A protein has these predicted regions:
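The conserved Walker
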Residues: 34
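Mid-chain, well-packed structural core segment of small domains
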Residues: 66-96
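Conserved lysine of the Walker
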Residues: 38
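Hydrophobic anchor at the beta1->P-loop junction of P-loop NTPases
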Residues: 28-30
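Short beta-strand-centered segment that lines the nucleotide-binding/catalytic pocket of NTP-utilizing
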Residues: 51-66
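Phosphate-binding P-loop
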Residues: 19-25
Length: 136
């Protein structure tokens, strides 16, 4: 599936389209260069799902938890600062990835060997004209 976002005003529409295709998937690994828009797109998805919390990149916390109106939650990870895979084991990644909650992961390259087999790889590319292309 491919979604093209020509400008920031259309990001919520793109998030709605993405949500329509989530299905039974729960773990999403977001790939893209620094500044490609991973956090911005995840924020739009969370807002469209009804999250009212302040949504920020969990770069220093590693994981943020956002509550949904139905009582479920979303886990938003940023593994940019992970130095060793042992850190992911120490935080108990299995408790999150296999909880049944939605998990949105930034910088999954650093933890690929522990991602669930059914994790959805989402690639965000910044195009020359400033638009973004999302492939999954």
């Amino acid at each position: 599936m491919e979604i093209r976002i020509s400008n920031l005003e259309l990001i919520r529409e793109a998030a709605r389209e993405f949500i329509e295709h989530i299905g039974e998937h729960r773990v999403f690994a977001f790939y893209g260069e620094m500044g490609a828009g991973k956090t911005t797109f995840i924020k739009a998805i969370c807002e469209e799902l009804g999250v009212e919390d302040v949504i920020t990149s969990p770069t220093f916390a590693i994981v943020n938890e956002y509550g949904l109106p139905d009582g479920d939650c979303i886990y938003h990870f940023d593994f940019y600062r992970i130095k060793k895979l042992e850190e992911v084991y120490d935080m108990g990644f299995e408790d999150y990835f296999y909880s049944g909650a939605l998990c949105f992961i930034e910088w999954p390259e650093l933890i690929e060997e522990v991602l669930p087999e059914d994790a959805v790889k989402v690639n965000i590319t910044e195009n020359a004209d400033g638009s973004r292309t999302i492939n999954y």
